[in-house]
């Protein structure tokens, strides 16, 4: 299975060094969305324009940008 990486981009960037094997791009996007919502919910101060999860493939090509989002009310 191909490996994908889920980097935090924006104000406080963090690089995913381990990555995760996913069956395809859709599964990687779904996992990136999960991460974006989890960070947004646990750290609502991070939800702002310019902060997002950058999903890259094993060749380093960015395939998705997923904005951080909070599910808290």
Predicted features, each with a name:
Residues 14-25:
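A short, exposed loop/beta-hairpin motif centered on an aromatic-Gly-Thr core
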Residues 6, 28, 53-55:
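Generic recognition of well-ordered secondary-structure surfaces with a strong bias
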Residues 16, 30, 63-65:
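Short acidic, gly/pro-rich beta-turn/loop elements at beta-sheet edges
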Residues 24-44:
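A short, charged, amphipathic alpha-helix used as a generic interaction element across diverse proteins
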Residues 41-73:
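Short, mixed-charge low-complexity intrinsically disordered segments
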């Amino acid at each position: 299975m191909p490996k994908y990486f889920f980097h935090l981009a924006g104000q406080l960037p963090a690089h995913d060094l381990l990555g995760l094997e996913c069956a395809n791009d859709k599964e990687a996007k779904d996992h990136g969305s999960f991460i974006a919502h989890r960070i947004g919910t646990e750290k609502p101060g991070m939800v702002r324009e310019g902060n997002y999860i950058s999903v890259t493939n094993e060749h380093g090509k960015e395939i998705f940008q997923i904005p951080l989002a909070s599910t808290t009310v």
